[in-house]
Amino acid sequence: DGVFPETKKNPIEDLKFDQDQWFCYPAKVGDLLCFVYFNVAYMAQGVTLCNLFQLATEEEYRNRKPDMIYVYGYEDGKKHQYFYQDDENDMMVALLSANDEFDYFGYMKKMMLTLHNVRKINKKQLPVHGAMVQITLQSGETKNIVVMGDSGAGKSETIEQIKVYGAAYIRDLITVYDDMG
């Protein structure tokens, strides 16, 4: 259902991992660093992360504590989909169990956005769920467009339609941010 309850206990604290069955994608989620650990069974969702979240460089993650840790596809025979605010370590932690019901990229993306947004709110910052593009018109004039809304509201589709219907007028379109800023 895409609603992730908060738990008062770290959901990954006592978990055991076979390192041959897991990958880590160090994602840049806005200005935050998220280590996304995904089971090899969910490779399709894991590699798709690069379409939405830029891969952090080694310089950006080496010897640095992440702001968020997300374990996706843990084989526990349950349907866990929790997040935890680890105040002691100043980070967000999340777990999503391996389950056919969760075998969908939206579950990976939405939990990451939930962690990002809760962390930003806790830091007294306003998370933006939207996108911004900078358009250079054929005349050379530059315009910025921000599209905001709930999940499924049509933000990405709106930007795609701007590209299609504005093609004759647009010289260049640069995505400033997509999904959060």
Stretch-by-stretch model annotation:
Residues D1, N117, S151, V176-D178:
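Residue-level signal for functionally critical sites in structured catalytic/ligand-binding pockets
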Residues L96-S97, A131, D150, D178-M180:
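Fold-independent oxyanion-binding glycine-rich loops
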Residues D1-K143:
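A noncatalytic interaction/capping subdomain that flanks phosphate/NTP-handling catalytic cores
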Residues L137-A168:
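Glycine-rich phosphate-binding P-loop
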Residues F105, L126, S151-K155, V176:
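Active-site-proximal structural scaffolding
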Residues Y169-G181:
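Short beta-strand-centered segment that lines the nucleotide-binding/catalytic pocket of NTP-utilizing
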